[in-house]
C-alpha cells in the first residue's frame, strides 16, 4: 500500500491526530506502528464502542498496523464500574466484552482473528517495570494536572473523588509505554491522557519509546469523534457557541439505554429507539440521526439509501454525506424517512453481532451480564 493511502486510512473519520507529521515520517520510513485502544468494562457495548471505535480499528488493520485491544479491568475497578466488583469486572472483560468487540469488528468488515487482546491485571501482575513507569510519569506531572485529567473517567473537573481516581491517569499513560505503543487511539474525551503521554515521553528512563533508528520518540495519538445520544438535550434550542462545550454531556451513554443502541439489540428495538430519537426537521447543527449518518453509516457503508413512497418524492441514494445534509437542511428529506432509512442500514450492519449473541457461549455471556446488572 502506498504511503498516502495508509495515511488516508488512518486519518479517515477522525477528530485529530497528535503528531501528524511524525506519523507521516514513520510511515515513509517503514516504521512498525503499534496501536492500542483501551476500554473500561462497564456493561453492554453500544454503537460508540462497537461501531465507531471498531470501524477505526478496521481502518488501521487495512493500513497494515498492529492492533491491540486493552481490557482495562483495574481502571474499571478504580472508576467504580459494575459496582466496583473486580471479580465481576474480570469475568465480563474476558467473556462478554471480548466477544462483543470481536463481533463488532466483524460488523464493520474486519477480521477479529487479527485482534490482540490484553487484560490489564495480567499485564500488571509481577511487572515491576510497569509500576516504575507509573511512578516516573507521576513524578513528571503536577498534582493539579492529574486532578484536571480525571475528566477522562467521565468525571467532572473539581468534583470530590477518592484518591484512587488520581492514580488512573498515570496508569493509563503507563499502559502506552509498557506495551511499546507508538500510536494510541481513543475517543476525543481521552485526549488529556494522550497529551500527558506526549509531554513526558522524552523524559522517561523506564519504558521509553524507541524507533527503529534507536531514537527516543513521543507516541502519536489518534482521536475519533464521540457520537451523540438519541435523546433531546436538556436545553433547546442550543446556541452554536454553546454546542461544543455540551457535546461530551450529549454523547451516547449506556446509562441512558433508550438513547443508545447496543450491538445486539433486536431489529424491533433498533427501530423503536430510532423512531423516538430527537431529529428536528431541517436542523443540522444538533441532530443525532445526522451525526450517526456522518460518523457511522457513510464510513462503514459508503452510502445511504432513503426509501420513501413515490407520493413523497420516491427513493433517493446518497454517496456523500454533505449532499445528504444539504438536502435535509432544505427540507427535501423528512425526519421520518431519514430515521427509517438509518434504522434499516444499522439493522443490516449489526446483523453479525445480533446473530453472534443468539446462541452458544456468547448468548450465555450476555445473559450473565444481564443478570449481573439486575442484581447489582
Task: Provide a role label for each language-model segment.
Residues 1-228, 232-236, 286, 301-376:
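NTP-dependent nucleotidyl-transfer catalytic core
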Residues 220-261:
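Active-site and channel-lining beta-strand-loop segments
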Residues 244-319:
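Internal helical hairpin/lid segments
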Amino acid at each position: 500500500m502506498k504511503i498516502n493511502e495508509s495515511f488516508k486510512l488512518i486519518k479517515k473519520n477522525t477528530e485529530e491526530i497528535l503528531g501528524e507529521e511524525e506519523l507521516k515520517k514513520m510511515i515513509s520510513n517503514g516504521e512498525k506502528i503499534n496501536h492500542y485502544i483501551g476500554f473500561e468494562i462497564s456493561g453492554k457495548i453500544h454503537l460508540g464502542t462497537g461501531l465507531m471505535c471498531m470501524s477505526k480499528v478496521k481502518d488501521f488493520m487495512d493500513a497494515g498496523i498492529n492492533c491491540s485491544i486493552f481490557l482495562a479491568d483495574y481502571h474499571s475497578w478504580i472508576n467504580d464500574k459494575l459496582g466496583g466488583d473486580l471479580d465481576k469486572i474480570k469475568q465480563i472483560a474476558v467473556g462478554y466484552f471480548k466477544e462483543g468487540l470481536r463481533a463488532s469488528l466483524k460488523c464493520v468488515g474486519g477480521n477479529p482473528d487479527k485482534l490482540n487482546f490484553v487484560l490489564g491485571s495480567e499485564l500488571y501482575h509481577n511487572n515491576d517495570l510497569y509500576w516504575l513507569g507509573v511512578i516516573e510519569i507521576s513524578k513528571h506531572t503536577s498534582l493539579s494536572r492529574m486532578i484536571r485529567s480525571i475528566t477522562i473517567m467521565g468525571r467532572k473537573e473539581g468534583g470530590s473523588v477518592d484518591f484512587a481516581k488520581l492514580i488512573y491517569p498515570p496508569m493509563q499513560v503507563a499502559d502506552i509505554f509498557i506495551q511499546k505503543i507508538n500510536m494510541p487511539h481513543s475517543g476525543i474525551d481521552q485526549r488529556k491522557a494522550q497529551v500527558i503521554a506526549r509531554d513526558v515521553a522524552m523524559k522517561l528512563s523506564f519504558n521509553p519509546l524507541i524507533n527503529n533508528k534507536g531514537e527516543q520518540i513521543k507516541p502519536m495519538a489518534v482521536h475519533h469523534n464521540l457520537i451523540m445520544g438519541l435523546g433531546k438535550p436538556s436545553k433547546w434550542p442550543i446556541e452554536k457557541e454553546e454546542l461544543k462545550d455540551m457535546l461530551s454531556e450529549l454523547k451516547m451513554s449506556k446509562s441512558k439505554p433508550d438513547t443508545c443502541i447496543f450491538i445486539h439489540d433486536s431489529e424491533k428495538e433498533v427501530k423503536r429507539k430510532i423512531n423516538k430519537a430527537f431529529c428536528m426537521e431541517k436542523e443540522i447543527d444538533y441532530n443525532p440521526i445526522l451525526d450517526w449518518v456522518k460518523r457511522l453509516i457513510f464510513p462503514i457503508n459508503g452510502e445511504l439509501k432513503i426509501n420513501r413512497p413515490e407520493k413523497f418524492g420516491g427513493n433517493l441514494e446518497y454517496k456523500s454525506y454533505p449532499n445528504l445534509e444539504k438536502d435535509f437542511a432544505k427540507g427535501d428529506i423528512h425526519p421520518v424517512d431519514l430515521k427509517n432509512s438509518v434504522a434499516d442500514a444499522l439493522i443490516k450492519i449489526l446483523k453479525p453481532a445480533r446473530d453472534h449473541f443468539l446462541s452458544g457461549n456468547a448468548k450465555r455471556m450476555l445473559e450473565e451480564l444481564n443478570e449481573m446488572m439486575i442484581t447489582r
